[in-house]
Amino acid sequence: MIHACSVATKSSFSEFMLLKRSIELFHDVSWTISCDPYASNELSKFSNVRVLNLIESDEGCSHGTDDKEKTRRFTELAMTKFNAVEDSIDRNGYGLFFDSDIIFANPIDERVVELLNDEKIDAVLCPHMTNNLGLEAQVGHYNTGLFSLRSKSMLKTHVFLSSNPENGFYTDQQAIQFAAYEHTVLNLPINYNIGWWRFNERHTAPRLELLHIDDGKIKFGNLDAVCFHVHTLKKLDYKNYGQFLLDKILGLMDNSKNEKYYEIAKMIRGIN
C-alpha cells in the first residue's frame, strides 16, 4: 500500500484524476487530499480517499506569472499540502506527496517502497537534476512536486521556512533543501519525477532521446521511467514549458502496444 497525498481543486481536478488513475494502475493507494468544495464533493465517492476540506477556492491562483496577488493566493493554497502530509504521517507513518500534474508510467521500485516504510529514513526527495547549479541556487536543489516525509521535525522546519518568504527562500523548494540539512534523506534517481527542466539546457536536451519503448514499457535510458511531471489537462495562464515532453510521452504511449498506456493517453486527450 502506498500512502499518497496531494492537493485537488476544481481547476486541477482533471489532472489529479489522471494522477490517481495512472498510479492505481500499478499500486494499491490510500489518499489524503487537501480539497476545495468541488474536489471534496467528487472525491468523497472514493473509499480510498481521505478528504481534508482546507481550501475555499482556487480562483485567482497562479505561480507562473508576475502577478503578486495570484502568487500569494497560490502559495496559500499550496501550503495546505503540509496539512495533508502531516495527517498521513500521523495515521500511516509517512506521507508521499504528488503534485496533481504527475503521470505514472511504471510502478515505484520495490526498494523505494521499502525505504518509504523505513523508520530510519526521514525523507525521500527528488533533486531537480538540471545540471545548472546557478539556477538551482535560486530555485532550490529539490523539486517539491514529489517528496515523502516521515520526520515531523523536518516537516515543521519545512513549513516554517516556506511560510516566511521574507527570509529569502524560494517558496517550499529551497526551503526543503535547508530543512534536509539536519536529516537523513534518500534522493530518488533520475527516472522519478521526470520534468521538463531536466531537458532544458543545451547539454541536457539530448536526454530526451533516452526516452524510448522497450518491451512495451517507457524507459529512461536503462531505467523504467516511473513518473513524469508535466501539465496535461489544466488550463494555464502561462506558457506550458513541458509541452515538448508531453508530446514525447504521448508519442511513446501511442506506439507502446501497452493497454495501460493507451488508457492514460486517452485520458490526457480528454477521451472517455
Description of each model-found segment:
Residues 30-37, 123-126, 228:
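Short, hydrophobic beta-strand segments that form beta-sheet elements in well-ordered domains
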